[in-house]
Amino acid sequence: MDNTRMNSFLEYAICNRGTGAYHHLEQSSPSFPSCSGSPSSDTFHGEGAYGAGGSPVAAAHLPPQSPGFFPAPPGAPSLRGRCPERRVPNPKLQPRLRHHQLYLGQQDADAVYFQAAGYSSSTGPHLGSLAEGYCGAVGQYQQQQHLYGQEQPSYLPGVYGNLSPSLNEDKDPACPSEPCPNASRARTFDWMKVKRNPPKTAKVSEYGLLGQPNTIRTNFTTKQLTELEKEFHFNKYLTRARRVEIAATLELNETQVKIWFQNRRMKQKKREKEGLAPPAASRSAKEASEASDQSNCTSPEASPSSVSS
């Protein structure tokens, strides 16, 4: 088999991936794909083996090379027919490394997978010619990102610098001026001045009360209690005239007599409910029968005038 045809087949299979084979890299991050026997070139058309497939139309849609990269000097050795030598970066010059997983494309089932290290912008100018010769201008990833819908985060310091003002603007603004809680507490509204309940020391005429709320409990004497019990035995409810008369006799006021009768009636109802005292109806009927018996026994005899008549 002809080796020339085999080499051209390998070149076409590896490098002629179309515009989709470009990997979205940083401006300062060169990539090292697998070996290709094609020389580095500043143009994307010619042999058709430099990422654009030799299509002038595809090359026309690609943006110009990034100004951060410099072409290879004229006296640089040709890299055709041999693989580029992988260089290990100096950890002192570049302490931070970010690794990107790169695929040459999805058109072939046996797509070559490899891993390349991304370097900062300090090593970009030195390796720019080498990356440009094998993968084209790296600054084209932004255009391809919009063309093929591949969204990848940008790690460029300049992009972060541009985004930082917007991030600062997205932060919560300063707290608006609000009334201080201490000031609101110190402020007294008109509705707070209204007193819902009258004080205990209020005057009777001011609120129209029948008696003072802070009335002291009355301590009745034995004589007063005996007279009140006698009156309650005959009359459960007193008239106004009888209440005034009893109050004057017992040296009490009218309100004290009225309240005592109210409490005595409630006490009587409680006793009847508990069964400690007979109901008032049976007791009144019994008293009425006893009164009728007494009237019959003490009824006066007929007068002599009525008998003679």
Curated annotation (Swiss-Prot):
Keywords: Developmental protein, DNA-binding, Homeobox, Nucleus, Transcription, Transcription regulation
Signal peptide coordinates: none
InterPro entries: HD, HD_metazoa, Homeobox_CS, Homeodomain-like_sf, HXA1/B1/D1
Superkingdom per UniProt: Eukaryota
UniProt short sequence motif Antp-type hexapeptide, positions renumbered to this chain: 188-193
PROSITE patterns assigned to the protein according to its UniProt record, in alphabetical order: HOMEOBOX_1, HOMEOBOX_2
Keyword Nucleotide-binding annotated: no
Region (Disordered): 28-50, 264-309
Annotated GO CC locations: nucleus
Pfam families: Homeodomain (PF00046)
Compartment list: Nucleus
Biased composition (Low complexity): 28-41, 299-309
Any one GO MF annotation of this record: DNA-binding transcription factor activity, RNA polymerase II-specific
Record feature DNA-binding region, as residue ranges: 213-272
GO biological process, one term: regulation of transcription by RNA polymerase II
SMART domains, per the entry: HOX
Purpose of the protein: Sequence-specific transcription factor which is part of a developmental regulatory system that provides cells with specific positional identities on the anterior-posterior axis. Acts on the anterior body structures.
Family assignment from sequence similarity: Belongs to the Antp homeobox family. Labial subfamily.
Annotated protein name in UniProt: Homeobox protein Hox-B1
Organism: Gallus gallus
Protein's gene: HOXB1
